[in-house]
């Protein structure tokens, strides 16, 4: 099973609760967060899996070992947003920040900067040839997540994280001549395709 399903459940229930004024959707949100914690968060190896077996165990195969740092960081800010909506719920803040911390550590490229698109949970080869490219959207997710983490915790490390991702992304993805962002960079930060 994939983490996308509880993530979609979480964010959809947030929108339905807000727009319909129906607090019964909070139960759906709680269920989604519980599934993410129980099945996809792996504290023993400090990561969030993209896909797991039905029982939450890691599948030792290319697809099963794949980490998608940007997607997990998006999950972090969905949870942090719910924490904010609940009056800064400390348990949800811990969960969201833990996901953010783990996946920034797993996903940040120590040599060239930026977030890798895919990683292997055991640092084995990754199946997808674009695994080491830098896509625009994971950086946007990290900018949002780090800013939310900073606003909820006041911890300086999230200000530093936010500045790091913001500066790296804006210095490489931004088209300074025509505006907007390029979508895809090579690992070293060079524009791969000038599409927007």
PLM-predicted stretches and their roles:
Residues 1-196:
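Glycan-recognition and catalytic cores of secretory/periplasmic carbohydrate-active enzymes
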């Amino acid at each position: 099973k994939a983490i996308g399903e509880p993530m979609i459940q979480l964010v959809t229930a947030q929108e339905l609760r807000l727009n319909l004024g129906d607090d019964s959707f909070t139960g759906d949100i709680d269920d989604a967060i519980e599934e993410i914690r129980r099945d996809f968060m792996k504290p023993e190896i400090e990561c969030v899996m993209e896909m797991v077996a039905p029982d939450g165990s890691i599948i030792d195969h290319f697809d099963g070992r794949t980490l998608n740092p940007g997607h997990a960081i998006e999950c972090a800010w969905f949870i942090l947003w719910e924490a904010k909506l609940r009056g800064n719920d400390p348990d949800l803040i811990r969960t969201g920040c833990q996901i953010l911390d783990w996946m920034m550590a797993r996903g940040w490229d120590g040599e060239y900067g930026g977030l890798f698109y895919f990683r292997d949970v055991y640092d084995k080869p990754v199946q997808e040839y674009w695994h080491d490219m830098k896509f625009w959207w994971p950086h946007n997710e990290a900018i949002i997540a780090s800013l939310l983490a900073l606003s909820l915790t006041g911890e300086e490390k999230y200000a530093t994280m936010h500045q790091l991702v913001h500066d790296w992304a804006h210095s490489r993805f931004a088209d300074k001549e025509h505006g907007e962002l390029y979508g895809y960079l090579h690992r070293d930060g060079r524009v791969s395709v000038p599409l927007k």
